[in-house]
Curated annotation (Swiss-Prot):
UniProtKB keywords: Cell membrane, Germination, Membrane, Transmembrane, Transmembrane helix, Transport
Main localization, broad class: membrane
UniProt KW Oxidoreductase keyword: no
InterPro entries: Spore_GerAB
Its membrane topology: Multi-pass membrane protein
Entry similarity comment: Belongs to the amino acid-polyamine-organocation (APC) superfamily. Spore germination protein (SGP) (TC 2.A.3.9) family.
NCBIfam families: 2A0309
Coiled coil: none
Record gene name: yfkT
Name of protein: Putative spore germination protein YfkT
TM stretches of this protein: 10-30, 36-56, 81-101, 107-127, 143-163, 179-199, 210-230, 262-282, 297-317, 326-346
Length: 358
């Protein structure tokens, strides 16, 4: 029985979109829509919600089963192929996030530490978290997202003296750039397809799934609003990490001029929970491919393979950023087309089953 509460699922979903979504995708969004990038997350939300609604409609008849379980029951062969595609997708996401996290820690905090050592420490912690199961993951998300989310929401107030509202004008300057920015936002918001794969409709209903994507989009928009209003769109788009740069601007007192370290201390557990969540969904998916696969034995090799893929697929920072250019295309397949295919498979199976009974 899934013991995850709806609120825990909500926090996990918001955390999953926020953890890395506030880093690289905003650079491409600002390059496209300039000062209007911060509210183009609305488009990403609008695109993803129909797919999530479709998944929850399928689960409505079987309240205690998630999409993976429904696929495994309704169509063993096609279901396994689709589950494998989802597993490969989240493996790619995890490889990107691990490589990005290693780069960030290496550049900002530990420049003399070998990247292989950083990768080993990160994945060791992620494996320990993932092995405890999704109940532990969602509880950690609830614990760590709350303080970090509060800090993000109060960010515009702490930067009030540095905000220049003229950096946000003119509003809605050009439809095509705005649509392009929303396209990059979809690259982040589409990751929320993880919720119906992990949680049943009884534990995390559609209402809370939508709240999760809205909360994640709100926090991302506030962070991007702060960056653009302080630095302006042209300068912000040149930063490797706009979120970190705007946090560096916070000066609470003369004695607390490195509050970025405090905020980083709250963000690091957030991204660790996301990495562990991606590792968990990959191993969880693999357990459906063959009955003899032991999930407990798969976390370590899958985690180490994720680190290797991170170094293999992404050789430098530019490739990490460029991945966000093609990620929305991947999300069209994974977050839009696959849910539609799943709906057709399960509905057709139910239809033919009903005819066979008659």
């Amino acid at each position: 029985m899934d013991k995850t509460s709806a609120y825990q699922g909500l926090f996990f979903g918001a955390l999953y979109t926020l953890a890395v979504g506030l880093k690289h995708a905003p650079i491409l969004m600002i390059e496209s829509a300039k000062q209007n990038a911060w509210h183009s997350y609305i488009l990403g939300v609008v695109i993803v919600i129909p797919a999530l609604w479709l998944m929850h409609r399928l689960m409505k008849k079987h309240q205690d089963k998630n999409i993976y379980e429904l696929l495994s029951d309704s169509s063993p062969i096609a279901g396994r192929i689709i589950i494998l595609l989802f597993s490969l997708y989240f493996l790619l996401i995890n490889a990107h996030d691990i490589r990005f996290f290693i780069n960030l820690i290496n550049i900002l905090f530990l420049p003399r530490t070998p990247m292989a050592v950083l990768g080993g420490v990160i994945i060791f912690v992620a494996i320990c978290i993932a092995r405890e199961g999704k109940e532990t993951l969602t509880r950690m998300a609830q614990i760590f997202l709350f303080p970090f989310g509060i800090l993000v929401l109060f960010l515009p107030f702490t930067l009030a003296t540095q905000i220049e509202l003229q950096n946000l004008t003119p509003v809605f300057e050009g439809l095509i750039p705005y649509l392009q920015s929303g396209y990059y936002a979809f690259g982040t918001m589409g990751e929320l397809i993880i919720l119906p794969l992990l949680f049943s409709n009884r534990s995390v209903p559609l209402k809370y799934t939508i709240f999760a994507i809205l909360l994640g989009a709100l926090l991302l928009a506030v962070m991007l609003f702060s960056s653009i209003s302080v630095f302006g769109p042209n300068l912000t788009s040149t930063f490797f990490d706009p979120a970190y740069m705007v946090i560096r601007q916070i000066r609470i007192t003369d004695f607390l001029d490195r509050s970025d370290l405090i905020i980083a201390a709250f963000w690091i557990p957030v991204i660790m929970v996301k990495i562990a969540g991606s590792l968990y969904i990959v191993v969880y998916g693999l357990s459906f491919l063959h009955s003899k696969i032991d999930p407990k034995a798969m976390y370590t090799p899958t985690g180490m393979f994720s680190v290797v893929c991170g170094f293999w697929f992404f050789l430098n920072t530019n490739q990490l950023i460029d991945f966000n250019r093609i990620k929305p295309i991947i999300n069209v397949v994974i977050s839009l087309l696959l849910p539609l295919l799943i709906y057709l498979i399960i509905k057709s199976k139910a239809l033919f089953g009903a005819k066979a009974k008659h």
